C-alpha cells in the first residue's frame, strides 16, 4: 500500500478456528506470524511488482543502496523483524473482531488458508506504511504506538490479498464503483510508463471507468505518476494522480499529437460521484475499495457520506 493518508484508512487480518487443506479457502482470516528469517526470504524475492518497476521506481527505491535492484532486495529482507507477544496478541484480537463481523453478516470471502503477516521497518517502501505481496501483509514495526488503528489497517490490507488472488472477486468489487476489468493490460507509451510510481497493492493497469471531462464522457484508467525524473527525497513528493483516456477495444492509452493525454482528477466533474466520498485515499480504485472494505469489516458504517458503496459491497460479498 502506498499509505500517505493512512492510519485512518486501512487494515485487516483475522483469526480462524478450523484447519483446512493447503489449497482451500476460508471466509475468515487465519493469521500466520512469520519469523524474521522466513520473512526476509520472501522480501528478497524478485516478484511481479519488482519486475514491473519503472525507471522512477528504481531510482527512488535505491538511494544509498549499492547493487541496483538486487541490492534493494537484500535491503528489504534486512528490514524484517520478529513479532513479540504483545503485537501478536493485538493482531489476534483485531482478527477476531473482523471475523466476528464476517460471520454476523454471513459474508463469503475467498481468503487463502492463511494470511501471512510480516513485521518490517517499512524502510524498503520509504516508511510509507503497510503493503501486501502475494498472500502476505507487511506491517510496520510500530503498530503498538497506535493500537486503535490496527483493526482498520488489517481489514484494508486483507482486501488487497483478496483481489490479488481472486480475479472474479476483484472484478465484482471494481464494478461497485463503475470500474471494468479489461482482458489484458493497458499499453502506455514508454515516456509515461517510466514515470509511473508503483504501488505494491495495485496488481496491474487493466481497469477503467467512464468519467465526464470537459463535458464529454471518456473511458479512463487511473495512474500514479511523476511529472519529472527522480532528483532525491521521498517519492511521495513526486506523486500525482492522473486519468489516462484509453481505447477499451485496443487496450491502449490515447495519444494526442504524439503525447500521452493525462487529465487530473479535478478535471472529471463526476469523479467523486463515481468513487464515493467515504475516503480521501483516492489514488487508485483498489485503495478506494480497500478503505470501504475496512469500514464494512470494522462496522464503522454509520453516517457515511456514500452509504451506497458499503451497501453494494456487502451485497456483493454474500
Please give the residue ranges for each predicted region.
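Active-site scaffold of zinc-dependent metalloenzymes
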Residues: 120-155, 164
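Auxiliary, metal-adjacent structural segments of Zn-dependent hydrolase domains
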Residues: 73-134
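Soluble non-cytosolic domains of exported or imported proteins
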Residues: 81, 85-93, 145-153, 280-288
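Catalytic Zn2+-binding segment of zinc metalloproteases
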Residues: 158-175
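N-terminal mature-domain "stem" immediately C-terminal to a signal peptide or N-terminal signal-anchor/transmembrane
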Residues: 19-89
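Sec-dependent signal peptide recognition
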Residues: 1-3
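Metalloprotease/metallohydrolase-associated module, dominated by Zn2+-dependent proteases
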Residues: 175-318
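C-terminal motif of bacterial Sec signal peptides marking the signal peptidase cleavage site
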Residues: 10-11
Amino acid at each position: 500500500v502506498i499509505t500517505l493518508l493512512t492510519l485512518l484508512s486501512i487494515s485487516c487480518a483475522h483469526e480462524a478456528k478450523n484447519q483446512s487443506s493447503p489449497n482451500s479457502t476460508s471466509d475468515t482470516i487465519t493469521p500466520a506470524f512469520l519469523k524474521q528469517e522466513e520473512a526476509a526470504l520472501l522480501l528478497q524475492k524478485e516478484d511481479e511488482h519488482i519486475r514491473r518497476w519503472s525507471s522512477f521506481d528504481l531510482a527512488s527505491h535505491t538511494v544509498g543502496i549499492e547493487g541496483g535492484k538486487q541490492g534493494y532486495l537484500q535491503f528489504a529482507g534486512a528490514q524484517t523483524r520478529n513479532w513479540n507477544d504483545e503485537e501478536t496478541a493485538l493482531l489476534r484480537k483485531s482478527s477476531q473482531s473482523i471475523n466476528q463481523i464476517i460471520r454476523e453478516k454471513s459474508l463469503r470471502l475467498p481468503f487463502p488458508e492463511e494470511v501471512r503477516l510480516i513485521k518490517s521497518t517499512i524502510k524498503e517502501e520509504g516508511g510509507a506504511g503497510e503493503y501486501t505481496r502475494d498472500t502476505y501483509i507487511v506491517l510496520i514495526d510500530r503498530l503498538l504506538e497506535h493500537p486503535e488503528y490496527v483493526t482498520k489497517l488489517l481489514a484494508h490490507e486483507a482486501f488487497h490479498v483478496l483481489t490479488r488472488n481472486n480475479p472474479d472477486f476483484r472484478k465484482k468489487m471494481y464494478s461497485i464503483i463503475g470500474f471494468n476489468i479489461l482482458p489484458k493490460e493497458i499499453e502506455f507509451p514508454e515516456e509515461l510508463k517510466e514515470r509511473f510510481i508503483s504501488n505494491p497493492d495495485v496488481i496491474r493497469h487493466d481497469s477503467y471507468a467512464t468519467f465526464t471531462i470537459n463535458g464529454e464522457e471518456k473511458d479512463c484508467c487511473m495512474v500514479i505518476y511523476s511529472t519529472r525524473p527522480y532528483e532525491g527525497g521521498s517519492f511521495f513528493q513526486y506523486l500525482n494522480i492522473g486519468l489516462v483516456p484509453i481505447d477499451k477495444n485496443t487496450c491502449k492509452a490515447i495519444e494526442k499529437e504524439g503525447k500521452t493525454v493525462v487529465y487530473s482528477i479535478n478535471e472529471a466533474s463526476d469523479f467523486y460521484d463515481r468513487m464515493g466520498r467515504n475516503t480521501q485515499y483516492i489514488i487508485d480504485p483498489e485503495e478506494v475499495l480497500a478503505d470501504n472494505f475496512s469500514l464494512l469489516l470494522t462496522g464503522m458504517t454509520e453516517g457515511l457520506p456514500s452509504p451506497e458503496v458499503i451497501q453494494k459491497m456487502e451485497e456483493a460479498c454474500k
